[in-house]
Design a protein with these regions (language model features):
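Bacterial N-terminal signal peptides
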Residues: 8-19
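A glycine-rich, often tryptophan-bearing local segment used as a flexible ligand/cofactor-contacting loop or short
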Residues: 30, 89-169
Length: 254
């Protein structure tokens, strides 16, 4: 697994999944989790779904020998237009975490999937013994607008559109009934008041939970999209990939 890969393909076609024609942008995809195989699904998604739109994508993978080290992240974020996060409970080096904070402070877009809600948060009993590493447990609430507290297990959830949000551009062309939520439903209630709920999920005997929403962060408000979907089987569903593409287009063009 390479830690830094640059993927570039010329503009070959424009798919209808984007809500509007998009100018070429520089995207950074940050990957550091061991559960949902996004180290495979996201590079494939970048190659097959993002780069045909002319975008340049830099994949940053956690170092195989040091799961908290993300080689190339600082350099990649300096000129990035958008950051997509798929990280679970990592404590990056402080300077790497600072580069993410700088991206956020500049009002640049952020997209989070699945475990991004607890990307830089440790479990309650865990401690950091290395002072060069940092945590950011508030990333979920401050940036993503969520409130992750766990999940309900592996039961698939029934996904539905929030009433009144049917015409939101991120949901354009999405057959929501085809979204399943293969990895189990996350507990994300309540969202921040500044979040806009788009999709909910329900499993029998439990309350309905937020599954996808938008948010704005920072003094220079940047667009944010988060979804608790992102299991490897979700990426097999064209409507889920279309959802992410729509979110990228929406985030890049306020």
């Amino acid at each position: 697994m390479k830690t830094l890969r640059h993927i570039w393909f010329p503009l070959l076609l424009l798919l209808a999944v984007f809500t509007a024609p998009a100018q070429a942008a520089r995207l950074v995809i940050m990957i550091g989790e061991n559960e949902y195989r996004t180290w495979e699904t996201l590079p494939e998604f970048a190659k097959n779904d993002i780069t045909p739109h002319g975008h340049h994508v830099t994949i940053i993978q956690a170092d195989e020998a040091d799961k908290n080290h993300f080689p190339g992240l600082i350099e990649a974020l300096r000129n990035a237009d958008l950051l997509l996060v798929s990280v679970r409970r990592r404590t990056p080096r402080r300077e790497q975490l600072d580069s993410i904070r700088a991206h956020v402070a500049a009002g640049k877009p952020v997209i989070g999937i699945r475990t991004a809600s607890h990307a830089f948060a440790l479990t309650p009993k865990a401690v950091i013994s290395d002072p060069s590493l940092g945590v950011w447990p508030e990333f979920d609430a401050q940036v993503l607008g969520g409130h992750y507290t766990g999940h309900y297990g592996r039961d698939a959830a029934t996904i539905a559109v929030t009433p009144g949000r049917e015409s939101h551009p991120i949901l354009s062309g999405i057959a929501v009934k085809k979204l399943i939520g293969h990895g189990g439903l996350y507990k994300n209630t309540p969202l921040e008041k500044t979040a806009t709920l788009l999709l909910t999920g329900t499993i029998p005997g439990q309350i309905t939970e937020p599954v996808a929403w938008t948010h704005h962060h920072g003094a220079k408000p940047g667009r944010v999209f988060y979804t608790s979907l992102g299991h490897a089987d979700d990426f097999k569903v064209p409507d889920f990939r279309r959802l992410l593409l729509n979110a990228i287009a929406w985030a890049l063009h306020p």
